[in-house]
Amino acid sequence: MEMDLSKVTLDIFTKLEQKWLSHCDSSRKTRILSIDGGGTTGIVAAASILHLEHQIRLQTGDPHAHISDFFDIVAGTGIGGILAALLVADDGSGRPMFTARDAVKFVAEKNSELFEIRYTGVFRRNKRYSGKSMERVLETAFRREDGKVLTMKDTCKPLLVPCYDLKTSAPFVFSRAGASESPSFDFELWKVCRATSATPSLFKPFSVVSVDGKTSCSAVDGGLVMNNPTAAAVTHVLHNKRDFPSVNGVDDLLVLSLGNGPSTMSSSPGRKLRRNGDYSTSSVVDIVVDGVSDTVDQMLGNAFCWNRTDYVRIQANGLTSGGAEELLKERGVETAPFGVKRILTESNGERIEGFVQRLVASGKSSLPPSPCKESAVNPLADGR
């Protein structure tokens, strides 16, 4: 009897899986949007997602189109993680709660509360940010009108947000895939954003616990290990056959990676040194964060060297120092094989416009729900 029940269960799951796979278009590339951490304003990413959404609406003729309609997964670190979560937070009907403009407006208007400065030390010279103020703002943002506090499962598209766990001395990646597998890997969205933003020199580590209380981590800024989360997103898609069954390699991917510019400190090399010639803690963090982003960009530049149009990286080239409009007018920077960087003839704005043409041509994202949401049969746990 036990063998018959197991066989029936397997047959049910197999049929559900076949039905699910039949809806997947194997010819369409899987679209990834990745947003870097770095800084407190996210000016490069903010300018980029505003232009991205504007172009999507312009080229589709749909004034209500959202960025999440044309991407299959969104990843973000630090301030980029907050923007990513805002873009995919589900309003309860399967639609995003925030447009790109809403998300950027939220970060801009709430910036002084998200990063409320307070001074510590005997002479009040040490600058830190108030974790309580950020937590209050984030918890309000990720709460629906009916009072429901959103978790990683409450996103209209897969979401990936990294942090660094001091308890295990290893990266910890929050994902919707993990949240769908088990409540032990499901976390409240506001806590995820708080965790990935806990820069060591400015915030205290943040203790985050899963919704069932079984998994916890002592989180600091994900930028220490994954400031540019693009590689993590690519790896996640390549190994997550449940949600992305048609992806066999980078040839099946279309990636837009949004940088956040060099940190304020790193933009002026001489300011990294104290008067005695030592580096400050915040300067070391800046160096690590910028280095991580550049290293990931070089790796992906090599991986996509035969199909460069499938990987677009938007980053400030450092030749101008202006606002959002100036950043979009800057000539783009591309990483060639072996770490060589070259200035392109296209501006960052033009590169986004060209990328949107490919997005629109491929149509709206139509990833079906995970099989585990259609069946009481739990798939084998294969990690996050």
From Swiss-Prot:
Domain PNPLA: 33-234
One example of a Gene Ontology biological process annotation: lipid catabolic process
A molecular function (GO) term: hydrolase activity
Keyword Hydrolase: yes
Known tissue expression: Highly expressed in roots and at lower levels in flowers and siliques.
UniProt xrefs under CDD domains: Pat17_PNPLA8_PNPLA9_like
UniProt keyword terms in alphabetical order: Hydrolase, Lipid degradation, Lipid metabolism
Name recorded for this polypeptide: Probable inactive patatin-like protein 9
Annotated source species: Arabidopsis thaliana (Mouse-ear cress)
